[in-house]
Each structure stands twice: as C-alpha cells, then as structure tokens.
Design a protein with these regions (language model features):
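P-loop NTP-binding catalytic core
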Residues: 1-18, 38
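General structural feature for long, well-ordered alpha-helical segments within catalytic domains
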Residues: 5, 28-32, 100
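ATP-binding Walker
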Residues: 15, 26-27
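Switch/coupling sub-region of P-loop NTPases
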Residues: 17-23, 33, 37-153
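Conserved P-loop NTPase
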Residues: 146-228
C-alpha cells in the first residue's frame, strides 16, 4: 500500500476500528495481519484467539453475547472492552470458526476490536462465508467489521473497503449505509485511487475526533511513512 493508505490504516487501527485481511493466499493474509499488529497502540490489551480451543473465558460479556461454554471455569485475567482480538476467521487449522467466529464478531458490539484474516477474493465472498452456517453472522453484525483489505498479487492490497455500521438518523430511523471503497489499486496507472476523502467525517466521528484533525494527522503520518520509505 502507498503512504496515504498506510497512514489511513494506521489511524483506524489506533482508533479501535476493526480490520480484516482477505484475498491472496492463506499464509500471505497471516503475514499482513501480523505486520499490522505493530500499529496497535502500546499498552493496548491484545487477545489472540485460540482457534477451535477458544473458550472466551477472558471475556466477561461472553455469556451475555450468547456464548455457551462447555469448558470448566478457570481463573484468567479478564479482557477489557477495547481489547483487540487477533484471529483467523477461517475454516482452517488454527482458525476460529463456527460459533466462536460468530462470538468474536458479535463482541464488536460490546466495545472490543479485531484484527483478523478471512477467506474470500471479494468483499461479497468474505461476507458470504461469515453469514452462512456454521458462523451465521447477520448483516448488522458484519457491518461492524470495519476495514476489509483485499490482497492481490505481491501481496499488494488491491482494494480497501470500509463497512459502515447501522445507525439512527436524527429522525430515529435506522440507516444501513452500503460499504464504501477507501482505495483501489489501478493496474493501468500503477498507483492507488483514493476515495476516503468522502468518509473523513464518518471515520473521524467513529474514533472520536474532528474531521479536520483527522485529515491533518493522516497527512502528517503519510509524510512520515513516505520519508521512511525513501530513506
């Protein structure tokens, strides 16, 4: 990704917006996901989900969110809302799948964040895999997945999508805005086309900031990244 997109991703991860890496090969997704963990703020609580052995004993809200644990209770340091879950939401060895994947997605409504991988070459594929059994996440839950990066060749991010959670308008009506593209890679020009400018107010509001401050900070970080790349 270029400096502008990298700065945007940095800001969203730091602000607690979830992120999913899809597309590409399975190992490529894991490499990109783990590299992005370096952008999690220092001191943040990071909880790596244990695949098919995950029992969410660390999550106080698990029962309220519908988790039915069959494991004996055991003392653990509880995770805090705002903790970043790290997972592979995939039906693969070491992956978190089925009811556990659904619980991880549902936990986003309780203030947790997520950096994960998922299978699927397109956004529709990703959402389709997670909406069908055995995960069975509903649309309003999937809309909280935040940023979805689709890998192409390289692995390069070919498209960065933003999933927008349902919200109420001033009249109290529930609005479910469609996903939006943050950036797309153009093979013709060998550069990214950026569209996040149309979502600045929404992104800034989601992380608790002002649009002008968000734009300035993104530009500052992009400059830092570009300078480091040239060095």
């Amino acid at each position: 990704m270029d400096a502008e997109l990298a700065a945007l991703i940095w800001l969203t991860i730091e602000g607690g917006i979830p992120l999913v890496v899809a597309g590409g090969a399975g190992e490529e997704r894991l490499v990109v996901r783990d590299a992005l963990l370096a952008l999690v703020p220092v001191g943040a609580s990071v909880m790596r989900l244990a695949g098919d052995r995950e029992d969410f004993a660390w999550m106080p809200q698990a029962g309220e969110l519908g988790w039915r644990s069959t494991a004996p209770s055991r003392p653990m340091q509880p995770g805090k809302p705002g903790a970043v879950m790290v997972a592979a939401l995939e039906d693969r060895e070491g992956g978190t799948w089925g009811e556990a994947a659904h619980l991880a997605i549902r936990a986003l409504t309780a203030g947790y964040s997520l950096i994960a991988t998922a299978s699927g070459a397109t956004l529709q594929d990703v959402l389709g895999h997670l909406s069908r059994p055995p995960v069975s996440a509903i649309d309003d839950e999937l809309a909280r997945l935040g940023v979805v990066l689709l890998l192409g060749d390289g692995p390069r991010v070919s498209v960065a999508h933003y999933l927008r959670p349902a919200a109420r308008d001033p009249g109290g009506h529930v609005q479910r805005p469609a996903p939006a593209a943050l950036a797309t890679w153009s093979a013709k020009t060998s550069r990214y086309d950026h569209f996040a400018w149309g979502l600045v107010a929404e992104l800034a509001g989601r992380i608790g900031g002002r649009p002008i401050a968000f734009e300035r900070e993104q530009a500052r970080r992009a400059s830092v990244i570009a300078g480091a790349t040239r060095a």
